[in-house]
Amino acid sequence: MWDGQSEMCQAHVLFDSFVQAATCKETLRAFQDLCEELNLNPGGQPQFYHTLRSRLHYWKAKALWAKLDKRACQKEYMRGHACTSTTCLIIGAGPCGLRTAIELGFLGARVVLVEKRDAFSRNNVLHLWPFTIQDLRGLGAKKFYGKFCAGAIDHISIRQLQLMLLKVALLLGVEVHVNVEFKHLLEPPENQEKRVGWRAEVQPSSHPVRQLEFDVVIGADGRRNTLPGFRRKEFRGKLAIAITANFINRNTTAEAKVEEISGVAFIFNQRFFQDLRQATGIDLENIVYYKDDTHYFVMTAKKQSLLEKGVILRDYADTEMLLSRHNVDQNALLSYAREAADFSTNHQLPALDFAINHYGQSDVAMFDFTCMYASENAAMVRQRMGHPLLVALVGDSLLEPFWPMGTGIARGFLAAMDTAWMVRSWGQGNTPLEVLAERESVYRLLPQTTPENVSKNYSQFSVDPASRYPNINMQLINAAQVRHLIDTGEGPVLGLDAVSSPHPRLTRQESMARYSKLLSWCQEHTHGYRKVCVTDFTSSWRSGLALCALIHTFRPDLIDFASLEESEAEFSGQLGLDVAEQEFGICPIMTGKEMSVLEESDSLCMVMYLSQLHELLKDTSPPSGSQSSEERAVLFSSSRSPISLLSKLGQSLSRKRNPKDKKEKEADSVGKRRRTSQAGQSEEEDALHDGNENKSPAETPGSEPKASEGHSKVRSMASLLLAKFEENSPSPSTTAIRRQNYIHMYTGGVSSLALQIANQIQSQQAQAPKLLHRRESGSQKDLPVNVGSSDVCYFCGRRVYVMERLSAEGKFFHRSCFQCDHCSSTIRLSNYTYDQLHGKFYCKHHFSFRLASVAQRKRPAPPVAPRPAQASLAASSASTSLSSLGSVGTATPDSWSSSTHTDMASSLAKRLCGTPERIELENYKPSPQKQDSPLQEVPEETLAQHNLSASLQEKNAEEQSSSSESDLEEEELVWKKGEELHARTNGERKLDLEEELKEEEGGEKLEKQEGEEEGEVSEEEQDEGDSSDESYEGCSDDPDIDVSSLSESKLCDQREQEESVPFHQSPASTESPVSMKPSESDLTPDPSTTPESSPAKRSEVVEEFWMKSAEIRKSLGLTPLSRELQPKHIAASTQTSNVKESFYTSVTYNTAALDSPNQSARICDSSTQTHSVTDLQETSPLGPTDGDAGVDLGRCSVVHRLSITVEGCVMADNQGLDSTSFATESVLNPDAGLPTPPYSPSHSPLVGKQCRALHHSEPILDREVMAFSSTCTASVPQRSSFKSDLEQAQSLPPDEIEILCGDEAEKLPERSCRMESGEVDNRRAEHSRTLPDRVVAPLLAGGPEVRLRRSEMKLWGPDADGDVKEKKRSSLFSPRKSRKNGNAAAESGRETGKHKSLWKTVFSVYKKDKKRKEVAVVAETLPAANNGSKRKVSGINRTTDLCFRKNPSFSEDTDMSCHALLERCPLRAQRAGTEEELNARLTRRVQRAARRQAKQEELRRLHRAQIIQRQLEQVEVKQRQLEEKGVAVEKALRGEADFWEDSSTSVLLDVHLCGMGKKDDPSLMHQWFKLVQEKNALVRYESELMIFARELELEDRQSRLQQELRERMAVDDHLKGEEELAEERRILSEMLDVVEQRDALVALLEEQRVREKEEDSDLEAVMLSKGFSLHWD
C-alpha cells in the first residue's frame, strides 16, 4: 500500500515538473519520465490521452483533464474516432504546426511532428485576437502559464506559446521528434508487393521516422518551398524594413510602470515620429512595444534614416543586397534600436540590456517586408502507384502575415482548424475532388478574416468552419475547378516556385473594341453641336469645342456653349479642362494652349484623358430639357464616382493659403470662427482661417468677454451637438486617447497590433531604378522641340510622359516627384496643401512648417548623451555610428544597372524559399569582423538563464499552483492557498507588480467564463483579480479620467507601493527613477483649505460647486474635478505620465496624523504603518497591544490600513431603505475641502497578500454574507457584548470593512475621541440624515470584527425627466445606437438626493469598480481560523462568482437597459436583493461594457487604417509598374527608340518589338489602351481607399474632440478663465464642423454604395482578380 502511494506521489512530482518545464528539451524529458513512471508508450498508441488520464489521478491533473475533456467531447471529433486510420506528418513545431497537431490528435489520427531544432528560442511577442485567447484557455493554457493573457493583455511570446502547445500536444499522444530535418517526400516504389506508400526523407537518415508511411503531409515550417507544387501570389508594397529588438525584463517596479505602446495610426497623428526624428535623427514609420518575458520592440524604419545613422553602409536597389550582413553595421543597428526604444518609452526603462538570440548574439534583427506571398491553394493531392497523399500548408507557408496587422497567429489557428476539418473529410472517405473543393472554398475566406467578421460565439468554435465563419458557402468552389490540384504524375506538374501574375490580360480584340467604343461614345454625345465633328483623338479636339460639348451634354449648367467661339480655341480648351477638374475630379493632362495645337502623336494624351471621362459618365443619361439646373446637379451627384467625390473633398480643403506669421496663427487659433465645408484638415491647418484672417479674437462671433454670455453660448451649442449626435451619427464613439508626452498611444487591449505602415516612404525608393536611370539620361536639354509645359516636370525639370503625369494647381509632374517640401514624403492629389506665394506643396501635417526657421533635417542629429548606467556601451555605439558615416554612400545609377542577372536570380530564389524572418535568422552573423567564423547555437537553457533569469523563479513558484481549479480537491486547494499565503506573509514571495499593473478589466469576461466552467477560481486567477487593483490602472481604459487631476493620488500611491514591497526583496526590485518620488511640498495641503480655516465657508463653496454644474453634469454624464489638483501637480504628472494612475487617493484617515497641520505630511507615509501592521500581527495577533504613543499610532494605522472598500450589497433594511453598491461614496477630506474617495487598497505585505485569496470574486450578496456569519455562531459571543461597539462605529467613514484585531475593537470609542469633534459631527450628520449605518455582526470570536458600512449613495434620483437625462448622458459620448425604452420599471425606482446621485456619477464614470476587494478576506486574515472556515469562504467565493458569471452578455450588450439586463439576470441573483440593488450593479456593468466596446471600436479603427494603408502601398507599386510599361509604349509610338536599348534588362510585358518603328502600329495602340484601362481602374480604387481614409480621420478627430470637451466640461464654468471658456467654444465649434463633414461624407458614400450595387460590373470582383481586397472592416 505504501509503495503504491509512493509511486503515485512520484508521478505527481513528475507531472508538476512537466507542467513547469520552461524549455523544449526539459518538457520532452519530463514527459518521457512521466510516461515511464506510468508504464505508457506514447509512440503510436491509440487513444493515448484516455489511457494517460485513467492512470494519473492527481488533483492538479484533473483540472487539466476537465479542460481537455470539454474540448474532446465536441461532436466533430466523434470521440476520437474520426481519423483513427490516418497517419499525418507535420513539418515544423511552430505555433501553427503544433495547433494543427492538437486538432488532429483530438480527431484520433496518428500524428508525427518533426522539428529541425530542439529549442524554442524566439523571444518575439505575438498579438492575439479574442478568439485565440479563448481557444488557448480552452486547451488549459493557464494551467501551464498562470499569467496567460491576464485581464486585457492580448499578447504572448512565441517561446511561451510554443511551450504551452507542445505540452498539450504531448498529452494528446502526438509524437514529437526534435533534431530531425525534413528533406523531401519519397514516392511509393514501383514494386508494390509490400504495398509501400508515401514516406519522408529525413536527416539523420537512420531515424525511425523515415520508415513510417503517411496519408497526410502538412507543411508548417514557414518556408515557401518545403512542399513543391504550390503557386504563390505576390503582394508587393513599398520598401518596408522592420527591426525587432528584445531587451531583458527584470520585472522591477520601474519597469512595471512603463506603458506599453500598442500602435499609433498614421492617419491620425505624426507628432511623435517628428519629435523622434528631431531629437535623435531616427525616422520611423511605426513602433510597437509589448512587455512580456522580454521588453519587445518592433518598428519600421525608413531607409534614408538607416543610411544617415550608419546602420546600412551602402544604398542598393535590391533589398536583398541592401540588408545583407555585409552591408549592415551591427553595432550601429544595436544603437539605433536602443535609442528608438529609449525615446519611445520616455526614457523610463532603467536598463536596456539586450536579450540574446539562439546564436548568443544581441537579439536585434532587420527584415524586409516589402513583398508578402500567399499560396494560391491550400492543399493538393498526389497519387502514385495507387497511393494518394494529401498535401497541405498552414502558417506562414500558406499565408504570410503583415506583422503590424497582428493577424499571424489568429489566421494561422483558423487555417489549422480548417486543415483538420479537411483531414477529417479525408479520413471519412470523401473523394479527393470533394475534399479539395471544400478546402479551397474555405480558404477563400482566410485572407479576409478580421476580429470583427468571425463568429462571436467563441466557446462554440470547432474544426467545422461553419462554427467560425458566418454565412460560409462550403460549395463556393466546385470539383471541376480543383481538378488541376490532383497530381497523378502523368500531366505537367506546376512549377516549383511559380509566382502567378495577379492581373488578367485584355485580348487584342477586346482592346480594339473598347478603343472603338470610346470614339463612338464621344461622337454620340457631341452630335448636333455646331462646329463639332469628332473623327479621331487629335485634330477633332483642337478647338476645344468638342470637350466643352461633351461636358455640356451631361451638365449644361456648367458651360454656356453658345458663347464659345471656334477662334478662341485656347480659351475653350482651358475652360473644358478646368470644369472637368473642378466638377469631375479629372486632372488635366495638358494645357488649353497645348490642346489647340494637338498633333498626331498626342492622341495618347487624349485617349488617356477621355477614357477617364468615359468611365465617369458612361452610366449617366444626359438630362432632359425640362429639368432645372438644380435637378441636373442632383441627378449627377447621385452618380458621382469615387474620383469626383474625392475631388470634391479635396476642393473643400482650402489649399491655396497665403502664409502668415506664426504669432498671427497662434492668435487666430483662439477665436477661430466655424467652418462648415472643410473636409480633412489636420490640427496645424485648423489653426488657419479661410478668410477674415486679420480679425482679432475679440471680434470673433461667440467670443464675448462676459462669462455669463459665454456660458449660455456653450450650453446652447452643447445642446445642438447633443441633438445632432442622437439624430445623425451612425457610428459609435470611442474611448479617449490617453496622451503621453509625445504621442497618442493606444494602450491596453490591443487589437492587434494596430500600427501605421509605410507612411510616406523615402523618395529614393518611390522612383524605380530604371526610371531614375532613364531620367538621368533624358535631361532637359535633350527634350524634343515640340515639348510643351505639360511635358516638363515642375519639380525635377525632366520629361514627364503621359502615363506617369499628374497635375495640381496648374503644375505637371511625375507621380514620384510630388513630395512634401518639408519632409520629402510622397503626397497624393487629394491630400496636399499649396503655398501659392512660394509655389511649394506640403503634406497636410507640415503646412504650418513652411516658414519655420529650423531647416529641414538632412543629416543625422548628434548622438544623445548616454545614461550613466550604460555609459561605456552607449559611447562605443555612438562612436561607431559616427565613424561609419564616412562610409555611407548612395549607389549611382551605373552601379544599379551593372548588377548581374545572377545576383538578381539568387536573390529572387532566396526570397521564394523563405519568409523574411527565416532568411534573417538563417543568415545571421555576429559581426562583419567574424563573418568567416562558424556560428554555434546556444543551448536553450543558457538562453533562458540570460533572458529570463529575473522572472523564472517567480514564474515557477506561481505555476506550481497553476492548475488548482478542481472542485473535486477543494480541501487540498484551500490547504495549498493557506500555505502559500503564509509564505507570502513571511516575505518569501514579492508582489508581482508587473502583473498588477498590466491586468485590466478587459479580460473579466473570459475569467468569468472559465470560472463558471470549473466551479472554482484558481489561485492564479485570484492573484490576477488582485492585480487589477485600481491603484495602478484606474484610468488605463476608463475614457473619462483627466490625467492631470490624478497626480496627487498617483504620488501617494507610488510611495505606498514602493515602500510596501516586502523587506526581503532584492535591491533590483526597488529601482525607481528619482522623479517618481514626490516632494514634501507636493504632499502638504494648502493652508487655506485646512480644517481650521472656516469649515462653514468651505461647505458653502462645495454646495455651490455642485448646484452650479448640476445641469451639464447630468446631461453629459460629467462631474467636476478639483481645480486645485490640476495646476498644482502638473509637473509631477508630466514626469510620471506613463504610470498607471488611480482615481483613489492613498490618503488614510489617520486621526492622529490629522490632529495638526504640521503632521499632514505623514498622510502618505506608509512605512510606519507597514511596520505597525507587521509588528502587531506577528507579536500579538489576538490580544491588545498597549504601549506608548508610537504604538498607539500604529494601532490606529492598523485600523485604517485594513480598511477595504467593498462593492457587495448588504441586506436591505426592512424599513424600505434602498440598497445600492459600496465603493461609490467618499468622505470629505478635511485637508482639501473637496470630495476625495476613501482609501481603499491594502498595500502592506501582510494584508496585500492575504487579500488575494478571494479578491477575484464578485460582490457578495447580502444573504450570503449573513449565511456566512451564521455558520460561525457557535464561536461568536453574545451579540449584546458588541452592542456598544457597534453603536460607536457610526463615527467611521461609510463603505468600509474594518478588521480590528482582538481587544482593539474595544478601543474604538477611544480612537473616535481623537478626531476633531467638529469633523466627526459633520461627517456623522452628513451620512446619518439619509440612512443609518448598517453593521453586520462580527464573524469570528477572538479574531477580527468585520464592520460593514452601508453605502448611502443613490444611483438614481427621482427626476420625472430622468429617462431623458439618462439618454442624453449616454448618447453624447457613448456608442450612438438607438436606446431601448423598456426600462420604465427601473426608472421608477429612482430616489431623491441630488448630491448623492452626482457622487454616484463621479465614481461610476471616473473609476472602474473594485470588484475583487471582498469581505471574505477575513477568514484568510485570522491566524487561528480553522480549515473549515477557509473552506466555507472558498465556497462563498465560488457561489458568488457563479451567480454573476452565468450571464456573459453583460459585457456584450452595451446598449441594453438596466431593466432588460435585470430580466436576464439569474434567478438566484434576483432573489438575493432588491430590484434597485441589482439595477445598481447592472448599471455599472453596462458602463464597463460600454467603455470596453468603445476601446474595441478604437482598435478596430486602427486595424482598418492599417489595411487601407497597406492597400494604398500596393496600388502605388502597381501604378509605378504601369507607368514603366506606359512610358515604354509611348516612346515606341513616338518613335523615340533610344529607350529600347535597355529593354534587355527590364521586365516590360506585352510590348511587341516588331512594331517599334511604326507610330501607328495597332499592336502598340492595343497595348496602350490596355494600360490606360488598368490605370483607370487603379485610380478609381485608390480614390475609394482615400475616401475611407478620410472618413477614418474625421471619425478619430471627432473622438479626440469629444474627449477634450468631456475633460473641460467636467470643471464648473465659474472656475474657468476667459481663455478656457473661449477654448471650450472653439472645441464645440470644431466638433460641429467635423460632425457636419462626416455626415456629408457618409451620405455621399451611401449614395455611391447604392449606385455601385446596381452597376453591372462589380469593381470588387475586378480588383480581387488583380490581387487586391476591398475588405477593410
Swiss-Prot record:
Binding residues for FAD, per the UniProt record? 96-124, 396
Primary location recorded for the protein, binned into one broad class = cytoplasm
Disulfide bridge map: none
Please, one GO biological process term?
exocytosis
**Which GO CC annotations does the UniProt entry carry?**
cytoplasm; cytoskeleton; nucleus
Name the catalysed reactions: L-methionyl-[F-actin] + NADPH + O2 + H(+) = L-methionyl-(R)-S-oxide-[F-actin] + NADP(+) + H2O
Q: Which major enzyme category is it?
A: oxidoreductase
List every stretch annotated Disordered: 647-714, 882-901, 918-938, 951-1100, 1159-1188, 1357-1393
Sorted alphabetically, which keywords does the UniProt record give? Actin-binding, Coiled coil, Cytoplasm, Cytoskeleton, Exocytosis, FAD, Flavoprotein, LIM domain, Metal-binding, Monooxygenase, NADP, Nucleus, Oxidoreductase, Zinc
Query: Coiled-coil ranges per the record?
Result: 1475-1531, 1573-1638
Q: Where is the composition biased (Low complexity)?
A: 882-892, 1081-1094
Domain Calponin-homology (CH), first and last residues per copy: 512-618
Q: Give the family, as the similarity comment puts it.
A: Belongs to the Mical family.
What does this protein do, in the record's words? Answer: Monooxygenase that promotes depolymerization of F-actin by mediating oxidation of specific methionine residues on actin. Acts by modifying actin subunits through the addition of oxygen to form methionine-sulfoxide, leading to promote actin filament severing and prevent repolymerization. Involved in exocytic vesicles tethering and fusion: the monooxygenase activity is required for this process.
Q: What is this protein called?
A: Protein-methionine sulfoxide oxidase mical3b
Its source organism is Danio rerio
